[in-house]
């Protein structure tokens, strides 16, 4: 999993999300969980802060842009996935001591891969086997980029994605699955 972090430049006077009132905050895109949906729900629920009412939202397009924007002083504050931040530090793109976290969320499930419910069971078995037997050590570039990953794990939508559904509900998003 990963966490959503609200970050500022290390030299920033901001110590808490409550201090963003009247400022501009960078998000990635409106469809991003950690780059918009989760921070919006958290800011509203925990700090009574709502975009356009209490602060001005801006969109960077992706987590890397938000991180670089804070790092270079283009954005005062941003919401990002810390897995992206950690990879940028490992690759030497940014120096860790130039960024400071003022909020970290609970852990969210990471990217999920699924299959259609009506696939032939034999094909489902082969797909699962391909994932669960993947050799993470066979590719040095993969190992460098995803240093913490050492296996795929099975997930259950009902339990493991509950936090994502709660965030969507807090943001007024509902699904009509048929």
Where are the model-predicted features located?
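Short beta-strand->loop
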Residues: 53-56, 89-107
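Sec-exported extracytoplasmic/periplasmic mature domains
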Residues: 44, 48, 71-76, 90, ...
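Second-shell loop/turn segments in exported
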Residues: 26-32, 71-75, 114-116, 149-154
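A bilobed periplasmic-binding-protein/Venus flytrap-type ligand-binding module shared by bacterial periplasmic
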Residues: 3-14, 108-122
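Short secondary-structure boundary segments
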Residues: 82-83, 117
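Hydrophobic residues within well-ordered alpha-helices
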Residues: 20, 70-71, 113, 127
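Bilobed "Venus flytrap"/periplasmic-binding protein-like clamshell domains
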Residues: 1-68, 75-77, 83
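An extracytoplasmic/periplasmic, membrane-proximal ligand-sensing/linker region
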Residues: 114-115, 119-178
């Amino acid at each position: 999993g990963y966490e959503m972090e609200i970050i500022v430049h290390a030299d920033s006077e901001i110590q808490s999300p409550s201090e963003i009132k009247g400022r501009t905050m960078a998000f990635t895109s409106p469809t991003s969980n950690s780059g918009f949906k989760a921070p919006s729900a958290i800011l509203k629920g925990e700090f009574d802060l709502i975009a356009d009412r209490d602060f001005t939202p801006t969109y960077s397009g992706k987590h890397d842009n938000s991180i670089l924007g804070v790092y270079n002083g283009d954005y005062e504050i941003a919401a990002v996935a810390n897995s992206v931040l950690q990879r940028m530090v490992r690759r030497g793109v940014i120096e860790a001591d130039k960024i400071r976290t003022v909020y970290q969320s609970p852990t969210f499930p990471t990217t999920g891969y699924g299959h259609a419910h009506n696939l032939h069971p034999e094909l489902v078995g082969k797909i699962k086997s391909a994932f669960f037997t993947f050799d993470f050590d066979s590719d040095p570039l993969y190992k460098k980029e995803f240093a913490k990953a050492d296996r795929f794990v099975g997930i259950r939508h009902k339990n493991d994605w509950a936090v994502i559904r709660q965030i969507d509900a807090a943001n007024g998003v509902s699904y009509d699955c048929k």
